[in-house]
Amino acid sequence: MKRTLDIGVLLSRSGMYAALAYASRLGVLQGVAEVNADHTLDVAFRVVERDPEGRLDRYAPLCREILRDSQARHIFGCITSASRKEVIPELERFGGVLWYPVPYEGFEASEHVAYMHACPNQHLIPLLDWALPSLGKRAYFVGSNYIWGWEMARIARERVAAAAGDVLGDRYIAVGDTDLDHIIQEIRALKPDFILNSLVGDSSYAFLARLAELKQEAGFQSGLTVLSCNFTECEVESAGSAAEGLVSAGPWFEPEGGSGGSFHEIARQSVHELAKLLHGRPGADVLPLSELVQSAAGSGHTPRLDPTNLHARQPAIIARLLNGRFQEIKRLPPLAADPYLTRQFGASHDGPLLKVVS
């Protein structure tokens, strides 16, 4: 007999990054359907859903509403780091857990967040370590004007400098802004070897379109390779042919050319992971996340999350978009997350790096 538990879903169906949220939402709902149909598990999930509509000011109130007005203690959602940081105080207030299934910039370890996707040592560092010897050392950074863009550029600047490279430009625009003339003009003048694109949603699609136009000009048929740690298959349709040639890093790419990418797949896996952590353990859904992970490990399940920092071990895959599909260039075996980059320049340490404390 299955016991049914409420889980929250906090993902936007509209707004400037709707394609990302749409893929994640479908992944959550697929995971719920699979768990509910799995007779080897004694848990089933009932979805309590709220739509923030891509508006930052709605995330915290809607998170509070889910935790206050339902039995849900585990919420799947948030796309931007800004929205994740908005809900953490509500998770702390009500003892909830956010299952965060998208890449982020690191430098965080909350006992109320399950970081299921990749952090910089699992995406940005491997991507730059491939790009600098392969493409050249003249870099240009462009990003959305919030913590994701800022931190990705900061980490990348350190890595490029360590490789004796040059950062030719580091520019930011507001999330959703598509006024890119000044950035395209600067890229035209500087001719970087590669561009780290940390723009989100509509801003990214507009940038790729403008850059594709620049590449048609004389003298720009080579170089200007775009690198990304957050562009997946779920955005190919929105970006169109302008994204061709983009090189992305992440833990998973569609093997058969699907459209969900890692945003869909990691969201789906996250639902399964929670179900396995709760299987055979009535009442465990109210445990603190670190205790839930540690106790599940003691009962024979090998959790995806590291109990010391609540980040998942993930492979690092580098792939290039060609003819609308990502083709793998390089793959690293699953890497333990190092959210504070204590090993980023080669220091070796096999023991726990970080303990989550309240």
Tell what function each PLM region has.
Residues D69-I79, W99-P101, Y140-F141, K191-F207, ...:
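Periplasmic-binding protein-like
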Residues G96-P126:
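Extracellular glycoside hydrolase catalytic/binding regions
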Residues A275-D350, V356-V357:
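Segments of small-molecule ligand-sensing domains
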Residues D38-G54, S110-H112, V160-D177:
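Short beta-strand elements in bilobed, periplasmic/extracellular small-molecule ligand-binding domains
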Residues S24, H39-G106:
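Beta-alpha junction/loop-to-helix N-cap segments that form part of ligand/metal-binding clefts
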Residues L211-P282:
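Extracellular/periplasmic periplasmic-binding protein-like sensory domains
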Residues M116-R171:
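An alpha-beta-alpha
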Residues T4, G8-L29, R50-G54:
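Extracytoplasmic "Venus flytrap"
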